[in-house]
Every structure is written in structure tokens, then in C-alpha cells.
UniProtKB/Swiss-Prot annotation:
Gene3D superfamilies: 3.30.1460.10. This is Uncharacterized protein ML2442. To M.tuberculosis Rv0487. InterPro entries: Put_sensory_transdc_reg_YbjN.
Length: 184
């Protein structure tokens, strides 16, 4: 007769197999004394170089959680409107806030649904959401900080390479053409 823990250990085995098959780096995290097994999975990206997703395997389900970005500095209403609208199009995960306002993706799947394809779908959705939404969240919630960083780098002759995705936000004396500031 199979016990609940047999099901948990089977799910853990399936998850680890799926992560290895996808060549994803992961490690076990045991820093919380609640009895859940947690795996921290590193999802490589382009817009955001790395997103860590935590898979918490419990007696009945697997909880998925990934930090997306810190609490916005400005335009909270615009950021939250974007997140709520985006939630309508996401599969198996949704945006939420923690108690300080940082933005996370969270989801849950039953242990019975855990297989290699489902793990791939869920982690794929996390990665797709972060890759699609990260720059938009920065534009909406950190526009002033981006402008200040751009100006600071210009004043010191620093590279703007990793800010080029935000060049359209920079309006130098009203002309809107940030391309004159592009540096290799």
C-alpha cells in the first residue's frame, strides 16, 4: 500500500528527472523548518539573466514561486493594473505581491499531475512571463530611476549597453532621440 510520503518522494524523483533532462541547475533548500522539500531551480533568461524558481513539494501539491522584481518606486497603479491584466493570460501561475510589495509569480499543481511535461510547462510559463514582462515592469515602476541612471552614465562617459532596452524612455530636452547617446 502506498503512503502519502511515497507519493511525495515519487513526485520529487519525477521533478528531479525533469530538471536534469532540461539541463537546469537546481539545489535542495532546507532553510525552512516546515517539513517541505524545496528545490531552487535556476532558469536562464535574456532580459533578466537568471530567475530562481522555488518548487516546494508538500503532501498534496507542489507550490511554485519565483521572485520577479522589487516593489515599484512609482506608478503603483499602472504596475498593478498591468499585473492583473497579465494574470488573465498566464497558465498555472499568477502574479502576486509579498508583504513588502515585491512582485512574485506563484502557482500550485497537484502531486497527481506532476510529470516531466507538466514541470516543463510550469517552469516554461514562469520563464516566459519573466522574459516578456520584466522590462515592462521596470518601465512602469522604475522610469525615474532608469532616467537617473542613464543621466549618471552619460555624465561619466559610462557604457549604456545594458540600458539600451530603455532608450525609448529617454527624452533629452524634448527631442525623444536617445540614439545620439548610444555607446558601444
Amino acid at each position: 500500500m502506498s503512503t502519502a510520503w511515497d507519493t511525495v518522494w515519487h513526485a520529487c524523483s519525477v521533478i528531479e528527472h525533469a530538471l536534469q533532462a532540461s539541463h537546469l541547475t537546481y539545489s535542495e533548500f532546507s532553510g525552512v523548518p516546515d517539513g517541505l522539500l524545496r528545490l531552487v531551480v535556476e532558469l536562464p533568461g535574456e532580459r533578466r539573466l537568471k530567475t530562481n524558481a522555488i518548487l516546494s513539494i508538500g503532501e498534496h501539491s507542489v507550490h511554485v514561486e519565483a521572485f520577479v522584481c522589487r516593489k515599484p518606486d512609482e506608478n503603483h497603479e499602472g504596475v498593478y493594473r498591468f499585473l492583473l491584466k497579465r494574470n488573465r493570460r498566464l497558465f498555472c501561475v499568477s502574479y502576486t505581491l509579498d508583504n513588502v510589495g515585491d512582485i512574485y509569480l506563484v502557482g500550485r499543481m497537484s502531486l497527481a499531475s506532476v510529470d516531466t511535461d507538466e514541470i516543463d510547462r510550469v517552469l516554461g510559463q514562469v520563464l516566459e512571463a519573466v522574459e516578456s514582462d520584466f522590462n515592462t515592469l521596470l518601465e512602469l515602476g522604475f522610469r525615474s530611476s532608469i532616467q537617473k541612471e542613464w543621466d549618471w552614465r552619460i555624465s561619466r562617459g559610462e557604457s549604456l549597453n545594458n540600458l539600451q532596452a530603455f532608450a525609448h524612455l529617454i527624452d533629452d530636452e524634448g527631442d525623444g532621440d536617445a540614439s545620439i547617446y548610444a555607446r558601444p
